[in-house]
């Protein structure tokens, strides 16, 4: 089985979006707001790495991966799995935002700080979670085609590992091609969402949520 050019093209498009959208967004934001500092961007990226890619994964290990009655229940009930995933992401990422604005960025004023932070938080997620994943997948499928198909590629590994590798590759190749394109497009709305959440948490920490909501009410 060879990989279709449509799938490879969609992987490439998503990789470009995921890798370069955060950079373009930061450059445009920096050009339009020359006085902003890069510190909030770096803090946002660092918070995502620490809270989402490190601390949250430790929690996932104990709740999802480690064999226990809890993991069996959560993995065995789709509603519990979805609820846990949503709560875990919310708790860890919003706690990270809160602590960042409360400590490292406590002296930073104005919504520009929150927006710059949001670009860093959502941008590094886009690059690490989707961008690198798409690049890795694209390299893999190009190698499969260069080898003449899945079976020739699988033959390169030891016999005891071939079954698992073949199953994983077939799962990847049977994924609808448009799914890979959607992964990149979804990053656009996700980064916007991260920026919006960062602004909300920023004003919450500053105690200005109510005032801003009232201002919005009277303006509208």
Spans of model-derived segments:
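Hydrophobic alpha-helical segments at protein termini of multi-pass membrane proteins
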Residues: 1-220
């Amino acid at each position: 089985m060879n990989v279709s050019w449509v799938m490879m093209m969609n992987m490439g498009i998503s990789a470009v979006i995921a890798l370069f959208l955060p950079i373009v967004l930061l450059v445009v934001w920096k050009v339009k707001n020359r006085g902003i500092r890069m510190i909030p961007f770096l803090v946002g990226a660092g918070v995502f790495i620490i809270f989402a890619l490190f601390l949250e994964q430790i929690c996932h290990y104990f709740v999802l991966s480690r064999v226990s009655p809890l993991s069996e229940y959560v993995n065995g009930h789709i509603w519990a799995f979805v609820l846990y995933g949503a709560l875990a992401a919310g708790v860890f990422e919003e706690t990270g935002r809160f602590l960042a604005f409360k400590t490292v960025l406590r002296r930073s004023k104005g919504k520009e700080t929150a927006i710059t932070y949001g670009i860093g938080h959502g941008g590094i997620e886009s690059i690490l979670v989707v961008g690198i994943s798409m690049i890795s997948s694209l390299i893999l499928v190009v190698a499969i085609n260069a080898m003449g198909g899945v079976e020739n590629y699988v033959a390169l590994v030891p016999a005891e590992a071939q079954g698992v590798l073949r199953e994983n590759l077939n799962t990847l190749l049977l994924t609808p091609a448009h799914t890979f394109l959607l992964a990149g497009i979804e990053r656009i709305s996700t980064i916007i969402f991260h920026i919006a959440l960062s602004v909300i948490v920023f004003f919450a920490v500053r105690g200005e949520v109510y005032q801003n909501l009232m201002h919005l009410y009277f303006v509208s």
